[in-house]
């Protein structure tokens, strides 16, 4: 049995002093203890990057050594997913895009290929069409799968919301986000992964007509959505640069956390965005330090609940109770 006494953020709330007991890779208890008997630093659940494009074992290593124990992926091969014994890769088995003639068939094929959720790419409001998108959502939900939709325009966000998507990936940048649309997102229980690190990169890339002056609209969207009570998910869109501006693996999640603080979330709320929030949004059995949960966690130097930059000061990482060297 392993016992650890530290200040702790459990994915939902803060403990100034907690004793965590671990046996056979599973947390058996989390109990309050005297902060004076705790070590320096803070325990956090293993971090979750809610939107990535994994392509190699090197990407897996970069994620793990940045304290990320779970990723929600679009691009990883089945072989990479199955060979990754420490980093949990929640895959979508590709994405729906363009013309989808048989929405139900697409979802069934993705599920057969190992999809744990369905990803839909909406370049614009005409790229898939309302009937096909609604069909994908209906078929996915019937199989118990969540649907995450890439939407970077107000029109595509509306389309995804109307279709009943569960998660929105990215936020529009070329125009301010409407308050009534944020209300609709909250009312439907949709979570949003703004990927600010990608939006910031796009804004300075000159690609797709983006300009640096567009980035404040992304920040405005996050502030508004957060104020309305929409769950925010930390996500980077980490990718090698083959289809979008490259965003690195692992360390960029900590940059994302900083950008979320800049956009108006508190450090404690941002920690939720990288742990409990994505676990709830994707229906994952991780992201929380509680009895019965896998002992995926990290010890950081400092207090990231007060200074979010401390999230990157990683001292130790555990996956299922085993320390990562």
What are these model-derived regions, one by one?
Residues 114, 161-168, 186-191, 229-231:
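Glycine-enriched alpha-helix->loop->beta-strand junction motifs that scaffold or abut catalytic
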Residues 6, 20, 25, 40, ...:
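Divalent metal-coordination and catalytic microenvironments
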């Amino acid at each position: 049995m392993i016992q650890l006494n530290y200040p702790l953020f459990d994915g939902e709330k803060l403990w100034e002093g907690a004793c965590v007991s671990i046996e056979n890779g599973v947390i058996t208890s989390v109990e309050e203890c005297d902060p004076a008997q705790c070590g320096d630093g803070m325990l956090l659940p293993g971090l979750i990057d809610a939107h990535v494009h994994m392509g190699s074992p090197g990407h897996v290593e970069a994620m793990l050594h940045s304290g990320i124990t779970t990723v929600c992926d679009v691009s990883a091969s089945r072989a990479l997913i199955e060979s990754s014994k420490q980093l949990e890769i929640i895959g979508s088995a590709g994405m729906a895009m363009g013309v989808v003639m048989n929405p139900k068939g697409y979802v069934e094929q993705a599920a057969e290929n190992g999809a744990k959720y369905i990803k839909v790419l909406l370049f614009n409001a005409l790229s898939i069409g309302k009937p096909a998108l609604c069909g994908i959502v209906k078929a996915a939900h019937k199989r118990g799968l969540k649907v995450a939709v890439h939407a970077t325009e107000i029109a595509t966000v509306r389309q995804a919301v109307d279709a009943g998507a569960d998660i929105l990936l990215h936020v529009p940048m070329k125009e301010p986000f409407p308050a009534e649309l944020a209300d609709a997102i909250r009312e439907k229980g949709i979570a949003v992964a703004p990927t600010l690190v990608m939006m910031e990169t796009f804004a300075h890339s000159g690609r797709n007509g983006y300009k640096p002056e567009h980035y404040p609209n992304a920040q405005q969207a996050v502030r508004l959505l957060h104020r309305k009570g929409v769950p925010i998910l930390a996500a980077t869109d980490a990718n090698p640069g083959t289809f979008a501006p490259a965003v690195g693996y692992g360390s960029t999640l900590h940059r994302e956390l900083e950008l979320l603080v800049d956009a108006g979330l508190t450090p404690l709320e941002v920690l939720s965005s990288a742990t409990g929030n994505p676990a709830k949004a994707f229906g994952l059995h991780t992201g929380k330090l509680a009895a019965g949960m896998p002992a995926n966690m990290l010890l950081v130097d400092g207090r990231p609940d007060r200074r979010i930059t401390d999230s990157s000061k990683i001292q130790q990482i555990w996956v299922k109770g085993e320390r990562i060297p």
